[in-house]
Amino acid sequence: MDVISCSSNTLKGLYDISGVEVGQHLYWQIGGLQVHAQVLITSWVVIAILLGSAIIAVRNPQTIPTAGQNFFEYVLEFIRDVSKTQIGEEYGPWVPFIGTMFLFIFVSNWSGALLPWKIIQLPHGELAAPTNDINTTVALALLTSVAYFYAGLTKKGLGYFSKYIQPTPILLPINILEDFTKPLSLSFRLFGNILADELVVVVLVSLVPLVVPIPVMFLGLFTSGIQALIFATLAAAYIGESMEGHH
């Protein structure tokens, strides 16, 4: 009985530890689900910015493009180039996916530096860039995983899984492990960089006058854009790899 009681207490302790969270969070109860309100709010703001900007810029296309139309055409051309370089000639259907990933991450990253999230008071926790939350980056990475599995299966059918035993069946465990590490590396790279950037700026602002952290903030904007490009480029590369069947 003592052994059973000890085991029960140990399991209860592990369960309690698993419920520990970092920081405070605001949750909404929707049906039987508990959703992370902070991430939803900031994500909706980012989506609204993207949709609003696109609608305003291209609602009345001109033969001689306006500044807004010209900007979005340049962004589209840039995303097409990235997709074509990484995926190949069959890049066309994947441009919307790669573009959505790039623009959402780019605007999310910049919103952490440019939008005054902190002045909005919540009952629990505080608002921050969507990509400052591990839930967002993991979701984006899992979407990428689903996309490259779908691309491979659509192109090759069940023959897609033969890649796991190439060039030799001995590499089967390593090839399987690789598919698990891809979303992990994508999500933690993005989350870590954005979180570290925001923490550095917050610490500098609290320690020194406002003028001093400005160069660091500009550097943060640059690295935030680079992180969006890296994520989109790797997503396109994984999709291209799954369609070609080589590593």
Swiss-Prot record:
GO terms for cellular component: chloroplast thylakoid membrane; plasma membrane; proton-transporting ATP synthase complex. Keywords: ATP synthesis, CF(0), Chloroplast, Hydrogen ion transport, Ion transport, Membrane, Plastid, Thylakoid, Transmembrane, Transmembrane helix, Transport. F-type ATPases have 2 components, CF(1) - the catalytic core - and CF(0) - the membrane proton channel. CF(1) has five subunits: alpha(3), beta(3), gamma(1), delta(1), epsilon(1). CF(0) has four main subunits: a, b, b' and c. This is ATP synthase subunit a, chloroplastic. The lineage of its organism: Eukaryota, Viridiplantae, Streptophyta, Embryophyta, Tracheophyta. Belongs to the ATPase A chain family. InterPro entries: ATP_syn_F0_a_bact/chloroplast, ATP_synth_F0_asu, ATP_synth_F0_asu_AS, F0_ATP_A_sf. It comes from the Eukaryota. It is a multi-pass membrane protein. HAMAP family: ATP_synth_a_bact. It is found in: Plastid, Chloroplast thylakoid membrane. The gene is atpI. Key component of the proton channel; it plays a direct role in the translocation of protons across the membrane. Pfam families: ATP-synt_A (PF00119). Gene3D superfamilies: ATP synthase, F0 complex, subunit A. The chain crosses the membrane at residues 38-58, 95-115, 134-154, 199-219, 220-240. It comes from Carica papaya (Papaya). One of its GO terms (molecular function) is proton-transporting ATP synthase activity, rotational mechanism.
